[in-house]
Every structure is written in C-alpha cells, then in structure tokens.
Amino acid sequence: MLLTVSTRSLQHVKREKEPIAPLDVPDFVAEQLGLKGLNVFSSLLRGMAAKDLERLRDRADRARCPVLVLVDETPLDFGGDAAAGSMRRVESLGLAASKLGAPAVAIELGALPPERFDHYAANVKRALAGIERFETHLLVRPGSGPAGDPQRLAELIKKIGGFRIGSMPTFAHAAAADDEGDFIRRLCPYAQAVEASVKAFGKSGKHDSWDLVALLDAVRNVGYQNTLCIDYGGRTAPVATIERARDLLAAAIDPAEDDEDGGEEAD
C-alpha cells in the first residue's frame, strides 16, 4: 500500500513565511515528508493555465511524486437544472487531470435523491463518458446526507458500471457512520483510492478523533491494497501532524520494516 498526501494538508505550511508555491509542492513532499504521491485539491490550481499544469506534472515526475488524483472541492449535483453544469465541470476536471498526468478525478455529490435515481445515475454516466477520451477514472467521494450513504453510493457505482467508475472512501466519513466496518465493506470493493482523514494528535501521540490503525485494518481486511492518502485540513502544526500520521500508518502497513528501522537506530 502506497502512502501519499493531499495538497490540502499543506495549505498552511510556510516556507520563509510564505505558503509553498504549487510548483514546489512535489519536491517538498518527496524530500521533506518522504512520501511519493499527491492528491491535488482543485483549489491549488486556481489561476493556473494549461502550461502551468504541465509544468507541475513535470516537476512531480522529476521528484518521483506523481499526481494520482485530482480532487474537486465543490459538491456537484447531477439532478435537474444543475446537471448540465456539473457535467461540464467534470469534463474540465478531466482535461486538467490529463495535463497533470493524474489517472483519476474525485468528486463529491451534492445530492443523491431517492426519486429519479436512474436518471441521476445516467447523468453521472454521461459525465464519465465526457472524460473517457482523457483515459481518466471518475471516483465518488462520500458527501453529506444521502450522498454519504455507503449503500446508496455503492448502488450508484454499480448502476453506472464499468472499470472507470469507482469510489474514494474517507476515514472521516467511515468514523462518522453508525457502523464504520459496514461503511468500509460497502465502498472499499469499488475504491481506487482511500483518504486517511487526519485530525489532531494528543500529547500521548494518540489520534484524537478516531483510531487510524483500526480503520486501516478494516480497509485492508476487504482486500484493498492501493493508495492511502493522508489528508489533514487543520492549521496547527501541519508538518508534524502529517509526519505523525505517516509514521503511524507506515508502521501498521509494514511492521517488519518498522522493526528493522528501530533495530538500526539501536545499533
């Protein structure tokens, strides 16, 4: 399982009292955090032209820290009058992802109404068809209310069908569910990426809001072995928090490697 990080995690990191420039993010992640992949949130790309996206891709490739998922932060509605705009948005995201070299786009649904479910699914499928020429996958992140119901999301993905539609479950949504194990069992079979949502760590080193290792174990128990993206949305000590999450998750993913590192330090 490959540990990666989201650009949202770095939004409050300062270098010489300034935020990290978008083009410098891959080098920072690879050299300072020791992570080898990025989920780029769409807010990072504001004001960037196509040539800038290609430069970011080149920097990421040179740093061996590729962009794996382009994550849109605005919930999209594929029902009623909003559907056409949402489909255009997905097409724009697909084009941006192709410039970044990202194989997947992740979106959050703003609604998932029980009525006219088939029509809603058909519109999402049309949006997916609009990015097929970019060879881009479309991943659905859990949203609020019915759009966060794992059973409904799984039904939507099955209804759309094909290998280019998938899910992107998050630890935060799983922890908030009535049954986190059921949440993961329903969505992870369709997952092409998983978001390891992170909050603050206590003085003891324990994660305050949910058990990161227990959620990781639940994900692995359903056979998931793809990327796990650390996502920290807080302002306080972002680098230290990311590093704590990285070390905790890395040790759980490969205990033998962690033991070897500890043995070398003891020598």
Predicted segments with their positions:
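Active-site acidic/histidine proton-transfer and metal-coordination neighborhood
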Residues: 59-169, 176, 248, 252, ...
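Boundary/entry segment of secreted carbohydrate-active catalytic domains
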Residues: 1-22
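Acidic-and-aromatic substrate-binding clefts and catalytic sites of carbohydrate-active enzymes
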Residues: 15-18, 40-54, 75-85, 111-118, ...
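Hydrophobic faces of well-ordered beta-strands that scaffold small-molecule active sites
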Residues: 1-8, 36-40, 67-72, 105-107, ...
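Catalytic domains of carbohydrate-active enzymes, especially glycoside hydrolases
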Residues: 21-43, 100-101
